Amino acid sequence: MAFNKQAESKKPNFLVIVADDLGWSDVSPFGSEIHTPNIERLAKEGVRLTNFHTASACSPTRSMLLSGTDNHIAGLGQMAETVRRFSKVWGGKPGYEGYLNDRVAALPEILQEAGYYTTMSGKWHLGLTPDRYPSKRGFKESFALLPGGGNHFAYEPGTRENPAVPFLPPLYTHNHDPVDHKSLKNFYSSNYFAEKLIDQLKNREKSQSFFAYLPFTAPHWPLQSPKEYINKYRGRYSEGPDVLRKNRLQAQKDLGLIPENVIPAPVDGMGTKSWDELTTEEKEFSARTMEVYAAMVELLDLNIGRVIDYLKTIGELDNTFVIFMSDNGAEGSVLEAIPVLSTKPPVKYFDNSLENLGNYNSFIWYGPRWAQAATAPSRLSKGFITEGGIRCPAIIRYPPLIKPDIISDEFVTVMDILPTILELAEVPHPGHKFQGRDVVIPRGKPWIDHFVHGKPVHKDTDFSGWELFGQRAIRKGNYKAIYVPKEGIKTEWELYDLSQDKGELENLAKVHPDILNELIEYWLVYEAETGVVTAPDDFVAENVGLFKPAKHNL
């Protein structure tokens, strides 16, 4: 291959690390004050991707990551939770199965067939039934949290023990078998997932190259952390999210991640009070939620460090392609638990007093203002197809290919990871047939030529589309068009030049109608190629608006 491969003939290993709902600037290489030395080390020894894009929510991104194609093709055209609630719209439609479907050859399946040891520990969110467990999609060893989230201490009060509660699938599995959460002693998600992955790697045949998948559930709600880590951030956020946002933006400028003259998107409080409107007690409560969040991120980093150190100890680190990423923008929804769980959290089982926040028996999230401090300068947060929902931090370390401490602003997507890994492993994609079934060709593009020769990853004629919760976006080059249905307001396409307008502030639809019309035509192509099923605007605005901004903001 074109890059300087290591002398040994052994194929490269792969470690894919996914943070859950981590904001753009929540780690120090991207401007955070949170203590993340291990992620910092990855950045110093690798490349920061500042134009890396995902879907706007978790399971669609994960389907794209493991399939190399669009979520509407891979089975997560909408999140499974949304399809169940609105089955009349999306139920039974191809690409809306709610699990990683059989139309795609999953990355671990392909690598396992090529002789790789495949292992995962962490969040799955790509199928709840035994025929859809990770062990059925190519993972030799797996410890998985099946649904989209869970208590970080494995505390499930009254819900699963109560026979009156409808049947719920097992939360955790080890390979083919359910795991009783009550058997997980001294459990904290990030600690346990890293420990299990290390154990899995210890048990492999030492000469066998590996693909390891480490999808953490941190810092997804409920925000929880061991007390000693929360205490480290006591008082750190007492000035509120606006000050944090200002400090993060300046740090990004100092790091060379954004231009000095960038104009950030305004904050949309989504009906919440501004910091100055809060009482002293409300400020203290809000700041504490951010302290817990920061503690979760630090623990995430600590456990990434444990895995990296293990690989170094066994002499495999420099032969391992490591990628760290977030699955979407920071979670800014005020009532995010409700649309996912389809019910209100059982508050009576939790103690959300100030001193107990972050403990195993609390249930909290931090809301839109803290989230948008993390996604700035981009617009909004998770759930939106604006940049705040889909532009995520990503870092790659792989010495045979990537020089240390560099920044790439090349537009890339999560779909590119599969073809990149396959090219590095010298394993061809199976094409249209795999294990006796018809499969699709990946839409993603490999990154090798970009890192070695500086070539663009995507051609001038390439376009990228997004759709989730009825929101639509299409991008070609630096221009991006978005379409977001709103209650009581006629919806029109908007146009933005992201090279000049990272906050998506200046709608150019009337200035460049020719560019907008071209992008709308590309949207129609994307819609046809991927099988997007769009509900009527009024239905989307009224019913599927799980993430509703103020009317003036979109």
From Swiss-Prot:
Domain of life per record: Eukaryota
Entry keywords, A to Z: Calcium, Cytoplasm, Hydrolase, Metal-binding, Nucleus
Organism: Schizosaccharomyces pombe (strain 972 / ATCC 24843) (Fission yeast)
Pfam family, one: Sulfatase
Principal location: cytoplasm
GO cellular component: cytosol; nucleus
InterPro entries in the cross-refs: Alkaline_phosphatase_core_sf, Sulfatase, Sulfatase_CS, Sulfatase_N
Positions contributing to Ca(2+) binding: 327-328
Entry note: cofactor: Binds 1 Ca(2+) ion per subunit.
GO molecular function list: arylsulfatase activity; metal ion binding
Localization annotation: Cytoplasm; Nucleus
Protein name: Uncharacterized sulfatase PB10D8.02c
Catalytic activity, EC: 3.1.6.-
Cofactor requirement: Ca(2+)
Family designation: Belongs to the sulfatase family.
